[in-house]
């Protein structure tokens, strides 16, 4: 299904900087466990930029869909170097995976 396809995308494009499992380590980017419904810039123990702390959004399907298209446009000053996923279908699949994989 969508989440299976999303896992492949995550493995190819996100895994080098992010973990998803509860209690997973921060890498270059924060651990994403508990992502959905969390305010942005709130993973405990991760050093965020002021830009990431100041946007004031809550992560959910729509905000992730917009963010993942072009992270630097959505949050100017973010240190996430990922250029974004322009393909809408890939973003839907990735978000489906994240929704499953980041549940606590």
Swiss-Prot record:
GO cellular component: mitochondrial intermembrane space
Keywords assigned: Electron transport, Heme, Iron, Metal-binding, Mitochondrion, Respiratory chain, Transport
Primary localization: mitochondrion
Localisation per UniProt entry: Mitochondrion intermembrane space
One Pfam family cited in the UniProt record for this chain: Cytochrom_C
PANTHER family tied to this protein: CYTOCHROME C
Protein name (record): Cytochrome c
Organism: Cornu aspersum
